[in-house]
């Protein structure tokens, strides 16, 4: 069963869809947190269907400025995104048949920063799942991504060095608050360079403003305050996220939190989308076959039903 819902975060109206499994409940539930860029509620359709068959309700929503939601995601900080995720948890908690004490956040990519941050802000988050989430800052991740994307594409080392030099120079200007139109004009002068597409932005000042806002976010302090169960999964072949460093930082920070209920998994052969190497001509490999089985099995243990009163 699916129903359209509306909820608010700091005056911005957001629209999404709740999926409920059969039966009266109360059911555990999952709120999905998208990664970077624009995204609508259908981003997690496959995962929501699997969870519904396993007895979980879920909520996916249009990011600000996408689909039926107001606002603009590029105006947000990661703290704003975390507040939005908590508003989604509150929306789920108010749905018929949902157990408000058993709601998890599942964040993918950039959502892997948002989920733990939200959990560090509110006990309403009962568990956190991070899929390909980074344990380093957005700036450090972007340096890693640009370098590894270019090398993976076979770009010459002098071009890789030129790209990284520009990236560092642009970051310095963004940090000190230089005029964004001037920063963008300087960037666009390089748009014919071999390395330019690896910058991965849409060439508008709004995106530069968003990056400047989040560049130096350190996920460790939030992770150090997360005491609910955490599942983090990475792909060994991820060229977007430094997997070894991320897993190490997750483990250290959650250890400092005294969190005894976390599980960290690195899947051999998988990429950032948790897909295996492609076998067909479309260049897109299959999803890890047992990914959602792993997630649902873990969720059942992390969100057990309350014991019947004696």
Residue ranges and their predicted role:
Residues 1-23:
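N-terminal cap/lid segment of alpha/beta-hydrolase-fold proteins
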Residues 270-274, 279-310:
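Catalytic active-site module of serine/aspartate enzymes centered on a nucleophile-bearing elbow/loop
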Residues 131-221:
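Accessory cap/linker subdomain of secreted extracellular hydrolases
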């Amino acid at each position: 069963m699916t129903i359209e819902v509306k909820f608010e975060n700091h005056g911005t109206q957001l629209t999404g869809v709740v999926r409920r499994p059969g039966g009266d409940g109360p059911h555990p539930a999952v709120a999905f947190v998208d990664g970077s860029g624009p995204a609508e509620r259908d981003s997690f359709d496959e995962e929501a269907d699997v969870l519904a068959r396993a007895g979980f309700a879920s909520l996916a929503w249009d990011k600000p400025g996408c689909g039926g939601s107001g606002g603009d995601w590029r105006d947000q900080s990661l703290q704003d995104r975390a507040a939005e995720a908590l508003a989604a948890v509150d929306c789920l908690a108010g749905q018929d048949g949902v157990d408000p004490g058993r709601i998890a956040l599942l964040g993918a990519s950039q959502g892997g920063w948002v989920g733990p941050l939200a959990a560090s802000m509110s006990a309403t988050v009962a568990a956190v799942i991070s899929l390909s989430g980074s344990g380093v800052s957005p700036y450090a991740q972007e340096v890693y991504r640009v370098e590894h994307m270019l090398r993976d594409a076979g770009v010459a080392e002098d071009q890789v060095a030129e790209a990284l030099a520009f990236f560092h120079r642009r970051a310095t200007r963004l940090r000190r608050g230089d005029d964004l139109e001037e920063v963008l004009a300087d960037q666009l002068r390089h748009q014919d360079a071999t390395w330019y597409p690896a910058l991965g932005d849409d060439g508008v000042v709004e995106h530069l403003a968003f990056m400047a806002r989040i560049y130096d976010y350190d996920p460790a302090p939030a992770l150090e305050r997360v005491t609910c169960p955490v599942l983090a999964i990475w792909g060994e072949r991820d060229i977007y996220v430094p997997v070894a460093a991320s897993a190490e930082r997750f483990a250290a920070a959650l250890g400092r939190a005294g969190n005894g209920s976390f599980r960290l998994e690195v899947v051999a052969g998988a990429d950032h989308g948790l897909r295996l190497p492609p076998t067909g001509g479309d260049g897109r490999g299959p999803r890890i076959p047992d990914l959602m089985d792993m997630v649902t099995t873990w969720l059942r243990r992390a969100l057990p039903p309350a014991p019947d009163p004696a």
